[in-house]
Design a protein with these regions (language model features):
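Electropositive polyanion-binding surfaces
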Residues: 1-178
């Protein structure tokens, strides 16, 4: 079992690296949890980051969603895609202005933008300005949406993508399963 999980983890890391090389944007955010006292008042803040196991599961869920979208594209039926358009240029310029004031660089050239965004995320990880920059970066992105017209998924760097892996909590996944 250990060998199998170790192998799966190596595969997941390879898939993740390939996604990043293809232009995927990786938000490794902290998850914030509050510990409560006996009166349900917060007495401690705990910051959690994704562990290797979380990333392993994430990569295979993304892969499953991608493969289902690729398979269904070959059919003639209408299909629900999860799409994510290019980021808003004006919002990216605003982000560039803010990060420059904080001492960082953001290259808005389309050929280097994704690498530059990921580099910025890496450089600010764990620093005081991380949450601000993460939030501004997310706001500069287009909103992902469900549609029958595929335009790809910018943030994941996928040509075709859908939601398939969580039919218990997302209705679009149920539609895809049908």
């Amino acid at each position: 079992l250990v060998d199998a999980i170790t192998t799966l983890n190596q595969i997941a890391k390879t898939i993740r690296k390939k996604r990043i090389n293809n232009g995927a944007i990786i938000f490794d955010k902290y998850e914030i949890k509050f510990k409560l006292d006996e009166k349900n008042k917060p007495n401690e803040v705990v910051f959690k980051t994704a562990k290797s196991a979380n990333k392993l599961i994430e990569e295979f869920m993304l892969l499953a969603n991608k493969r289902v979208a690729e398979k269904m594209k070959k059919g003639k039926e209408r299909f629900v895609y999860r799409v994510h358009d290019q980021p808003d240029e004006e919002k990216l310029k605003n982000l560039q202005t803010v990060v420059k004031r904080l001492g960082y660089n953001l290259d808005l050239n389309k050929n280097r933008l994704n690498d530059s965004l990921n580099t910025l995320l890496e450089k600010t990880f764990g620093k005081n300005e991380q949450n601000l920059i993460d939030t501004l970066m997310i706001r500069s992105m287009s909103k992902a949406e469900y549609t029958t017209k595929n335009i790809g998924h910018y943030g994941l760097a996928f040509d075709k993508y859908t939601h398939f892996t969580s039919p218990i909590r997302r209705y679009p996944d149920v539609l895809v399963h049908r």
